[in-house]
Amino acid sequence: MLETLRERLLSVQQDFTSGLKTLSDKSKEAKVKSRPRTAPYLPKYSAGLDLLSRYEDTWAALHRRAKECADAGELVDSEVVMLSAHWEKKRTSLAELQEQLQQLPALLQDVESLMASLAHLETSFEEVENHLLHLEDLCGQCELERHKQAHARHLEDYKKSKRKELEAFKAELDTEHAQKILEMEHTQQLKLKERQKFFEEAFQQDMEQYLSTGHLQIAERREPMGSMSSMEVNVDVLEQMDLMDLSDQEALDVFLNSGGEDNTVISPGLEMESNPSQNEMNLQIPNPSESASQPPASPSACTDLDTADAPLIQADEEEVQVDTALVTLNTDRKSTPGVSDDSDQCDSTQDI
C-alpha cells in the first residue's frame, strides 16, 4: 500500500514536470510563430505580462501544493511504517499466543501430575516430620538424663568437699578456741597477779609514807608500770584528792599506835566518823582544767584503803573460771581500749 502511494506521488510529480515543460515549449513556439507577424501586428505587452504572471502564480501554487503533498506523503509514510511495525508485533504475539494455546492441554496434564506428586510428597513430609519430632523428644530426654547424672555427680563431689572443709574448719576452730581459752586463762591469771602485786606494792609504799610522815603526798606521783599499760586503773580524781589541814597529828599517832597494840585494823574513815572533833580531814578536789593540765599518775591513792581487799583479790585469783562471757569481754576490751580502762576504773573504785 505504501509502495503504491509512493509510485502515485512520483507519477504526479513527473506529470507535473512534463506539463511545465510542454507549457514552456508551447510558449517558445508561440514566440517563434509570432515573430514574423511583428510587422503587420503590434505586440500587446500587457496581455503577455498578465498571462505570464498568471502562469507563474499557477506554477507557484502547484509547486507549493506538490511540496505539501510530498511532506504529507512523508508523514503518512512514517506513520504507515510505525503502524506496520506495530501490527507486525501484534501478529507475532498472536502467533505465539496461538502456539501457547495449542500447548495448553499438555500443560494441564503436567500440572495434574505435579499436583499428585505434591500430595504424595506432603504425606511423606508429614510422616518425616512426626518421626523427627519423636527423635527430638528422645534426644531431649537423653540430654536431660545426662545433665541430671552430671549434676548429681557434681553435687555429690561438692557435698563431699564441703563436708571435708567443714570438718577441717571445725577442727581448726576447736583447736584455736582451746588455745585461746588457755591463753586467756593464763593472761587473766597474770593480770590478776600483776594487779594484786601492784596494789600491794602501792599500798605498802603509801602506808610506809603515811606512817613516816603522817600524811600522803599525792603530788609526788610514781611512774606507771610497763606491765600495767593494758589495765591501768584511771583514778585521777582520787589521786588528785589531798589530805589537808591535819590539825591534830598527835591524836592520829595515838590512833595508829593504839591500833598497832590491839592488833586491830581500823579504817581512818571510821576513826574520823567516831572522833570528828579530833581529826579534821579536808579532801580537796582540783578543777577539771587543772586535772587535764596535769599528767596522769599511778593509782597510788586508790590503795590507801585496800588492805582489807587484798585477801579478796587473792580469792578471786584462785576462783577464776574462763567461759564464753570472759572471751567476749576480752575481745570487747581489745576492740575498745577506752571502755576497758573505764571498766578497770569502775572495778578499782568498787574495790576501794
Curated annotation (Swiss-Prot):
Coiled-coil segments? 92-180
Modification note: Ubiquitinated by TRIM32. Ubiquitination leads to DTNBP1 degradation.
Q: Which UniProt keywords apply?
A: Cell membrane, Cell projection, Coiled coil, Cytoplasm, Cytoplasmic vesicle, Endoplasmic reticulum, Endosome, Membrane, Nucleus, Phosphoprotein, Synapse, Ubl conjugation
Q: In which tissues is it expressed?
A: Detected in hippocampus neurons (at protein level). Ubiquitously expressed. The highest expression is observed in testis, liver, kidney, brain, heart and lung. In the brain, found primarily in axon bundles and axon terminals, notably in the cerebellum and hippocampus. Expressed at lower levels in stomach, small intestine and skeletal muscle, where it is detected at the sarcolemma.
Entry function: Component of the BLOC-1 complex, a complex that is required for normal biogenesis of lysosome-related organelles (LRO), such as platelet dense granules and melanosomes. In concert with the AP-3 complex, the BLOC-1 complex is required to target membrane protein cargos into vesicles assembled at cell bodies for delivery into neurites and nerve terminals. The BLOC-1 complex, in association with SNARE proteins, is also proposed to be involved in neurite extension. Associates with the BLOC-2 complex to facilitate the transport of TYRP1 independent of AP-3 function.
Q: Which gene encodes it?
A: Dtnbp1
Taken from the UniProt entry, a GO cellular component term is: neuron projection
Q: Which GO terms describe its biological process?
A: actin cytoskeleton organization; anterograde axonal transport; anterograde synaptic vesicle transport; blood coagulation; cilium assembly; dendrite morphogenesis; kidney development; memory
What does the subunit section of this Swiss-Prot or TrEMBL entry state? Interacts (via its coiled coil domain) with KXD1. Interacts with AP3B2, TRIM32, CMYA5, PI4K2 and RNF151. Interacts with the DNA-dependent protein kinase complex DNA-PK; the interaction phosphorylates DTNBP1 in vitro. Interacts directly in this complex with XRCC5 and XRCC6. Interacts with XPO1; the interaction exports DTNBP1 out of the nucleus. Component of the biogenesis of lysosome-related organelles complex 1 (BLOC-1) composed of at least BLOC1S1, BLOC1S2, BLOC1S3, BLOC1S4, BLOC1S5, BLOC1S6, DTNBP1/BLOC1S7 and SNAPIN/BLOC1S8.
Segments of skewed composition (Low complexity): 286-301
Residue ranges for the region (Disordered) are: 267-352
Q: Which Pfam families match?
A: Dysbindin
Q: Which InterPro entries match?
A: Dysbindin
Give the primary localization class: cytoplasm
- Similarity comment: family membership: Belongs to the dysbindin family.
Q: PTM Phosphoserine: at which residues?
A: 11, 340, 343
- Compositionally biased region (Polar residues): 274-285
Q: Where is this motif: Nuclear export signal?
A: 243-256
Please report the name of this protein according to its UniProt entry: Dysbindin
Keyword field contains Signal: no
Membrane topology recorded in Swiss-Prot or TrEMBL? Peripheral membrane protein
On whether Magnesium is a keyword of this UniProt record, the answer is no
PANTHER family in alphabetical order: DYSBINDIN, DYSTROBREVIN BINDING PROTEIN 1 DYSBINDIN
The record's subcellular locations are: Cytoplasm; Cytoplasmic vesicle membrane; Cytoplasmic vesicle, Secretory vesicle, Synaptic vesicle membrane; Endosome membrane
